[in-house]
Amino acid sequence: MSSPKFDSYDWENDPNWKEFTGTSTSINKLKEEYFKKNIDPNYKSSNNTTTQRPSTSSSSRTSSSSTSSPRATRAKPTFRRFLYGAWVIAQISVILFTLFYFISGNPYFFYKALLGATIAYSIPIFNTFEGRKPDRALAAQLVQDENAQFVFYCMIFYFFGSSSLVYLLPNFIYSFFHMLKIVIPYTSSVPFIKNLLEKVNSTNAKAIDFAISVEINIVLIAFFGIFSSFSNILLVFIYFRYLKLRYQFSQKIKSKINEYSQMVDQLSAHPSCPTFIRNIIPKIKMVLSR
């Protein structure tokens, strides 16, 4: 009697086959193995002509995730480079828009300079606090962060201040010296330019000290500006609160204000100082210190 053909074999009614397969899912492969072992030893598998489906096993998923993982890893440095580029552009915009405002007096450039500064200060804040959940601890740290304080500074004059070059000076000075440090290494091939920029950069400490002085004296400018409609009470009040915040958390601001306080004390102690001024100065200092 001839051996049964593989394709026509009655698999369903073979009790040994059912026991052989058990719970396996590769039915066709097991059929071929069983047929060759128990029915026709000369049977040759036709798997080499059968197209297999792509595996959806866990190993395949693992491989897929492992190939996407480096992409996710690479995305972060790319995003960091994007942020750095945005920070540089923002710093440049502060410089250019301040110069444009100085030349033209157009308030449009004044507000653009403030927006550029806001972006420039916001990027380091994002880098510092990225991924943090909003809570009281985060709010407390933001208040102490100098970049966050400068964002507050920009917002004060964007919403409450009239356009004035003096309000842009601190941001301009900080941005200018930031960019100077970036540009100098690229001027090595031109010694004259490099030496010139390095000389300018050597004035960094004096320039920053001047920016701090402007930042402090703005409160006086805003106060006296009330009488010429250049300023308003709300601006003076908000900026004074900002300055108290800076005094609390910035050592440079605190040192400069203390320096001014000593100068006022020396002037009030001078014999030529009018008595009423000498008497009113301690009262003013008491009110300001509250």
Curated annotation (Swiss-Prot):
<dbReference type="Pfam" id="PF03661">
    <property type="entry name" value="TMEM33_Pom33"/>
</dbReference>
<dbReference type="GO" id="GO:0016020">
    <property type="term" value="C:membrane"/>
</dbReference>
<feature type="transmembrane region" description="Helical">
    <location>
        <begin position="150"/>
        <end position="170"/>
    </location>
</feature>
<dbReference type="InterPro" id="IPR051645">
    <property type="entry name" value="PER33/POM33_regulator"/>
</dbReference>
<dbReference type="GO" id="GO:0071786">
    <property type="term" value="P:endoplasmic reticulum tubular network organization"/>
</dbReference>
<feature type="transmembrane region" description="Helical">
    <location>
        <begin position="218"/>
        <end position="238"/>
    </location>
</feature>
<comment type="similarity">
    <text>Belongs to the PER33/POM33 family.</text>
</comment>
<feature type="transmembrane region" description="Helical">
    <location>
        <begin position="109"/>
        <end position="129"/>
    </location>
</feature>
<dbReference type="GO" id="GO:0005783">
    <property type="term" value="C:endoplasmic reticulum"/>
</dbReference>
<feature type="region of interest" description="Disordered">
    <location>
        <begin position="1"/>
        <end position="22"/>
    </location>
</feature>
<keyword id="KW-1133">Transmembrane helix</keyword>
<dbReference type="InterPro" id="IPR005344">
    <property type="entry name" value="TMEM33/Pom33"/>
</dbReference>
<keyword id="KW-0812">Transmembrane</keyword>
<feature type="region of interest" description="Disordered">
    <location>
        <begin position="39"/>
        <end position="72"/>
    </location>
</feature>
<feature type="compositionally biased region" description="Low complexity">
    <location>
        <begin position="45"/>
        <end position="72"/>
    </location>
</feature>
<dbReference type="GO" id="GO:0061024">
    <property type="term" value="P:membrane organization"/>
</dbReference>
<protein>
    <recommendedName>
        <fullName>Transmembrane protein 33 homolog</fullName>
    </recommendedName>
</protein>
<feature type="transmembrane region" description="Helical">
    <location>
        <begin position="83"/>
        <end position="103"/>
    </location>
</feature>
<keyword id="KW-0472">Membrane</keyword>
